[in-house]
Regions:
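Short hydrophobic/aromatic beta-strand micro-patches
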Residues: 333-337
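Histidine-centered active-site/metal-ligand motif
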Residues: 174-178, 299, 329
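Conserved catalytic core of nucleic-acid polymerases
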Residues: 27-28, 181-323, 338
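Conserved catalytic alpha/beta cores of large enzymes that bind or transform nucleotide phosphates
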Residues: 125-147, 161-197
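Mixed-charge, glycine-rich, non-catalytic linkers/tails in nucleic-acid processing enzymes
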Residues: 1-11, 151-172, 226, 230
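Conserved "right-hand" nucleotidyltransferase catalytic core of DNA-directed polymerases
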Residues: 1-118, 127, 131-133, 140-143, ...
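Short acidic alpha-helix initiation/capping motifs at coil-to-helix transition points
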Residues: 12-13, 172-174, 198-203
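Short active-site loop/helix that positions an aromatic residue
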Residues: 19-25, 140-158, 338
Length: 339
């Protein structure tokens, strides 16, 4: 349909090819800061209003489902089961620095959940033990709750009126964090959720702008300023966590696990290769260096703490004789004996 309407045989995974479609339709799109290459994020394509752009997004989803999920699952199936490699923490074999589980051979955490058509079809390939039902249990808004917890227990932030307002809302009922923030900031829920998660994950302004589908830097700045003016505690927590990591060289998760910041870089802004303290001092001088990656401190705090919670729940279940089939981020899936 894209070729029929535009005359372009678009390669759905090639940004330059998609750009030709946008140019033909006279539609604006973002470019990368460094090389000015066309940039099309998943959110940008999915949220776009033009019907042909939505078809490109859908074609991508179908293609990814087939090549990444279905073909991979079939390749690793053995006697009706799949035994993936589980990585506890970052190593040469894979894993994450935050302590969250990751999977390889195959990566079962990539099984789609949100797509209303493909998700149920692919997930239906996984079945419980004989005579049981499939149980799926997850934490409600695990990461936003952790952000509120740390904001409400950090001395320089906890007195902020926006923190008190959200804490009170959680006390009264099970709120939708992203909807509450959107109401406070006067922006849409999808914008609030994108900014929230972007800040939680240490996403830069340029990436956030692309995720939000905003074509100009001015539009993005206006939206960010509106968000931070009315919901300042997220930015304050991000800055305070970064300062702590710079000062102490580590942050501690909810259950006390340490995430270290032991690489250094020159203090001036720019693209630099992080190195050991000894090498950095030798190259730049002791008073002209700073710890690297401290902007990721909030991300490590939140995801590391989420990993603590989920792993503790797995241990608690194991002590009761219950072993999950799979753990996906904040979700545990297991066989439940039918009543």
């Amino acid at each position: 349909e894209v070729k029929k309407e535009t005359g372009i045989d678009a390669q759905i995974w090639a940004a330059r090819s998609i750009a030709k479609v946008f140019d033909k339709l006279n539609l604006p799109y973002s470019r990368t800061l460094k090389t000015q290459s066309p940039s099309f994020t998943k959110n940008f394509l999915q949220e776009h209003e033009h019907p042909l752009v939505k078809k490109i997004a859908k074609a991508r989803e179908i293609n990814k489902a087939h090549t990444t999920f279905i073909d991979t699952i079939i390749r690793y199936e053995h006697k009706g089961r799949i035994h993936a490699d589980i990585n506890q923490i970052r190593s040469d074999q894979g894993g994450t620095v935050t302590g969250r589980f990751s999977y390889s051979n195959p990566n079962l955490q990539q099984i789609p959940a949100r797509n209303k058509d493909l998700g149920p079809l692919i997930r239906s390939l996984f079945i419980p033990e004989s005579g049981c039902e499939w149980g799926c249990f997850d934490y409600s808004q695990q990461e936003p709750r952790l952000v509120v917890h740390f904001a409400a227990t950090t001395p320089v932030i906890k007195e902020n009126i926006s923190v008190k307002e959200i804490v009170q809302s959680y006390t009264n009922n099970d709120i939708d964090f992203h909807k509450t923030v959107s109401d406070m900031a006067g922006i849409s829920r999808i914008q609030a959720k994108t900014i929230n998660l972007g800040l939680f994950y240490g996403m830069g302004k340029a990436k956030l702008q692309a995720e939000l589908g905003l074509s100009t830097k001015q539009e993005a700045e206006e939206l960010f300023n509106k968000y931070h003016d009315r919901v300042p505690f997220v930015r304050d927590l991000m800055h305070e966590t970064s300062r702590w990591a710079s000062r102490e060289g580590e942050i501690r998760t909810l259950l006390g696990r340490g995430c270290r910041f032991d690489k250094w870089e020159p203090a001036q802004f720019g693209m630099h290769t992080p190195m050991t303290w000894e090498d950095a001092v030798k190259k730049y001088g002791e008073n002209r260096i700073r710890r690297a990656f401290t902007y990721k401190a909030l991300n490590k705090l939140i995801q590391g703490s989420a990993a603590d919670m989920t792993k503790k729940s797995m241990l608690d279940l194991y002590k009761e004789g219950i072993v999950a089939h799979i753990q996906i981020h904040d979700e545990l899936d297991l066989s439940v004996e039918s009543k």
